[in-house]
Curated annotation (Swiss-Prot):
InterPro entries registered for this protein in UniProt: Fosfomycin_Res_Enzymes, Glyas_Bleomycin-R_OHBP_Dase, Glyas_Fos-R_dOase_dom, VOC, YwkD-like_dom
Stretches assigned to the VOC domain: 5-128
UniProt key word GTP-binding: no
Name of this protein: Uncharacterized protein YwkD
PROSITE patterns per the UniProt record, alphabetical: VOC
Superkingdom of origin: Bacteria
Residue stretches spanning the membrane: none
Length: 128
């Protein structure tokens, strides 16, 4: 099997409108398609970043809360590259999004920081 790339990442949110606004209006994802699935009472929102299909945002009635801690087994976080970490952090702060202090990766020497989506999913900004 030869894997070519990651096709998408699926995220289940607890408040669809809040998460949609966060990813679209605060982080700048573009809406590819929004579908209401009546049989499930839920939405599926396909989002792209710079023209590449990246995230499926799902809403389900009463989803259970996220149970994992950042260091638990399984998916830990999603990381996005940025040109200027200082500028990206400033933009997040201007939009009311708090970030952790900027740190330096001891293995690569690159700077990074974390912030959280409305459901406390850890998101990382990693400077190129």
């Amino acid at each position: 099997m030869l894997l070519k790339s990651i096709h998408h990442i699926a995220i289940i949110c607890s408040d669809y409108e809040k998460s949609k606004a966060f990813y679209v209006h605060k982080l700048g994802f573009q809406v590819i398609q929004e579908t209401y699935r009546e049989e499930r009472g839920s939405y599926k929102l396909d989002l792209s970043l710079n023209g590449s299909y990246v995230i499926e945002l799902f809403s389900f009635p009463d989803p259970p809360e996220r149970q994992t801690r950042p260091e638990a087994a399984g998916l830990r976080h999603l990381a996005f590259t940025v040109g200027s970490l200082d500028k990206a952090v400033q933009e997040l702060h201007e939009k009311g999004i708090e970030t952790e202090p900027i740190r330096t990766d001891p293995l690569t020497g690159k700077r990074f920081t974390f912030f959280f989506d409305p459901d406390q999913l850890p998101l990382e900004l990693y400077e190129q």
